[in-house]
């Protein structure tokens, strides 16, 4: 399996970051972890040090897109890595999930592949919901304490499907959009960079950056984001979005896009 750079974006909420790190301790994949912190005011940086993870910090808040582009720069500049994952801090990654994503890349000619999550966790892209493809996973799939059990069940179903010569039913499939809480890319993604350092356009400071990249770069080149139907990542949906708007005072008061987003939700 190729080597993975896992870039986790953070802004406060260190309790969720800690839970994410605990899930990483159980993995046996070949990954390096870098945390890109956007000016947290809690103990997030200290938590990163406690777990031994590199943490890139800011002197002022720059927004999520800036963090994503920083992750891309690390990936592009180091030939050691075959894959880049950009992920929120409010996730739990079960053992086996990353390996399934890599297998999808090895089998299919996609530049970006994403896992399934819960219906709530995938937000605006319900196509990624595990409940579309597996019966009997709910309600336990919505409980974080069962996140590893869900991945294990998926792999059991995969093996049963293989034995019945119906593995095609779980083939990776392309989608019209993806949710930005967790997405994995290979080196082909470099073809879509905006300039030598940025993969994502910088006019979207915090939200809609994945949609813009999807429509402008992926779909327009017939390189759709793809869903791996044998990989599951639990996402605490809502923790890393609107809660941040309420606390990200400097950006929300000075950047027009943030003001617009706050107005849309009555903030």
Residue ranges and their predicted role:
Residues 59-75:
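Glycine-rich, basic loop-to-helix element that forms the pyrophosphate-binding segment
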Residues 176-183, 188-193, 203-231:
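A short, conserved alpha-helix in the catalytic core of glycosyltransferases
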Residues 149-156, 162-185:
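A recurrent flexible, glycine/aromatic-enriched loop bordering the glycosyltransferase active site
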Residues 22-31:
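Short, acidic, metal-binding catalytic loop of nucleotide-sugar glycosyltransferases
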Residues 227-246:
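Active-site donor/metal-binding and catalytic loop motifs
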Residues 80-92:
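Short beta-strand-to-loop acidic/aromatic patch adjacent to the donor-nucleotide binding site
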Residues 37-45:
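A conserved acidic beta->alpha catalytic loop
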Residues 92, 96-143:
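Conserved donor NDP-sugar-binding/catalytic core segment of glycosyltransferases
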